[in-house]
Curated annotation (Swiss-Prot):
Cell wall formation. Catalyzes the transfer of a GlcNAc subunit on undecaprenyl-pyrophosphoryl-MurNAc-pentapeptide (lipid intermediate I) to form undecaprenyl-pyrophosphoryl-MurNAc-(pentapeptide)GlcNAc (lipid intermediate II). This is UDP-N-acetylglucosamine--N-acetylmuramyl-(pentapeptide) pyrophosphoryl-undecaprenol N-acetylglucosamine transferase. It is a peripheral membrane protein. Pathway: Cell wall biogenesis; peptidoglycan biosynthesis. Pfam families: Glyco_tran_28_C (PF04101), Glyco_transf_28 (PF03033). One of its GO terms (cellular component) is plasma membrane. It is found in: Cell inner membrane. UDP-N-acetyl-alpha-D-glucosamine binds at T16, G17, G18, N128, R166, S195, I249, Q294. It comes from Chromohalobacter salexigens (strain ATCC BAA-138 / DSM 3043 / CIP 106854 / NCIMB 13768 / 1H11). Keywords: Cell cycle, Cell division, Cell inner membrane, Cell membrane, Cell shape, Cell wall biogenesis/degradation, Glycosyltransferase, Membrane, Peptidoglycan synthesis, Transferase. CDD domains: GT28_MurG. The lineage of its organism: Bacteria, Pseudomonadati, Pseudomonadota, Gammaproteobacteria, Oceanospirillales. GO terms for molecular function: UDP-N-acetyl-D-glucosamine:N-acetylmuramoyl-L-alanyl-D-glutamyl-meso-2,6-diaminopimelyl-D-alanyl-D-alanine-diphosphoundecaprenol 4-beta-N-acetylglucosaminlytransferase activity; undecaprenyldiphospho-muramoylpentapeptide beta-N-acetylglucosaminyltransferase activity.
Length: 364
């Protein structure tokens, strides 16, 4: 069977960039092989901005998560699920995909159930080190189960393929930055708080840097998040530390390329990008992540010696300053960079595409 014999694939992913960005990488790879791709999402997730921008048809169904919705949410859940499944069945009937691929998010649950009820081939991919509720359920119905991390589905068998990473980011790590290059200029620290920002990083990083001797301080670029740029600039000014602060970073590949050490959260996509780009890191997992999955994500790089783990409960100016002082050495950073690249799974997209073709081949 050739790739062109699979002509239509429906991708289900939504909510956050951690689901949508890897799914977009898969969509681009499928389209490059002549496959028609459409998307199933919800009305409020980031897919509403990113998917149309990629010139992909986006179908929206009315669906929301169950966790945190209280007793009323659970009582209404069966009716809401039935409605969402009915909407998803309409999308599938109209687009008539040969394969449905779920990568997490609210729409994947009813969409995957609709695909199973309509006897369409279904595969799922889990980006985090522990599978979310939707993917755990769908893994029991799916024809193929893929994971970025070993053990994501517990005892359920899954093929570990990693997370898709953009080509321009993966290319950065082809030659990890060595100690000789790092000695030629001031070291560079990149702080990433995500689109909403991370208040703990915005307050503690400037104060930690202030504790370092001026000669040891790196050049700093700090992405502070929406509506947090001015306040973060003030914290740096009060600490007497120079930094370039921005609300967002439009070109992540350029930002990674600039950096020698990165302080950030431990989302699944971030972990994959750090490894691919060969970037040492200090990882501060988001403490309220479901099932504490960011801490589990971080273990891949931490156990390999490519990152240091700093739980937010232990994040103080003193502890961070001590860690920075230890890591801001050319030899240390060079060793960590090599270790990070060794953890990269650069063929994740190709293996997912192959999985799509294999699932469809089995149906012939």
């Amino acid at each position: 069977m050739s790739y062109r014999e699979v002509s239509r694939v429906l991708i289900m992913a939504g909510g956050t960039g951690g689901h949508v960005v890897p799914a977009l990488s898969l969509a681009r790879a499928l389209r490059a092989r002549g496959v028609s791709v459409e998307w199933l999402g919800s009305p409020r997730g980031i897919e509403n901005r990113l998917v149309p921008a990629a010139d992909i048809v986006l179908h929206r169904i009315q669906v929301a998560g169950l966790r945190g919705n209280g007793m009323a949410g659970w009582l209404l859940a069966p009716w809401r699920l039935a409605k969402a499944v009915w909407q998803a069945r309409q999308v599938i009937a109209k687009f008539d995909p040969q394969l449905v691929v779920g990568l997490g998010g609210f729409a994947s649950g009813p969409g995957g159930l609709a695909a199973w009820l309509m006897r369409r081939r279904l595969i799922v991919h889990e980006q985090n080190a522990v599978a979310g509720m939707t993917n755990r359920y769908l893994s029991r119905l799916a024809d193929g189960v893929y994971a970025a991390f070993p053990g994501a589905f517990g005892a359920h068998r899954a093929e570990v393929v990693g997370n898709p990473v953009r080509d321009d980011i993966a290319a950065l790590g082809e030659t990890p930055r060595g100690s000789d290059a790092l000695r030629q200029r001031p070291l560079r620290l990149l702080v990433l708080g995500g689109s909403l920002g991370a208040q703990a990083l915005n307050t503690q990083v400037p104060q930690a840097l202030a504790r370092l001797p001026a000669a040891q301080r790196p050049d700093v670029r700090h992405q502070a998040g929406r509506d947090k740029e001015t306040a973060t600039q003030s914290v740096y000014a009060e600490a007497g530390v120079e930094a370039e602060v921005s609300a967002f970073i439009d070109d992540m590949a350029a930002a990674y390329d600039w950096a020698d050490l990165i302080v950030c959260r431990a989302g699944a996509l971030t972990i994959a990008e750090l490894a691919a780009a060969a970037k040492p890191s200090i990882l501060v997992p988001f403490p309220h992540a479901v099932d504490d999955h960011q801490t589990l994500n971080a273990r891949q790089l931490v156990d390999a010696g490519a990152a240091r783990l700093m739980p937010q409960t232990q994040l103080t100016a003193e502890s961070l300053a001590e860690t920075l002082a230890t890591l801001l050495e050319p030899e240390t950073l060079a060793t960590m960079a090599t270790s990070a690249r060794a953890q990269a799974r650069l063929d994740a997209v190709e293996r997912l595409v192959a999985g799509c073709m294999e699932a469809n081949r089995d149906s012939q």
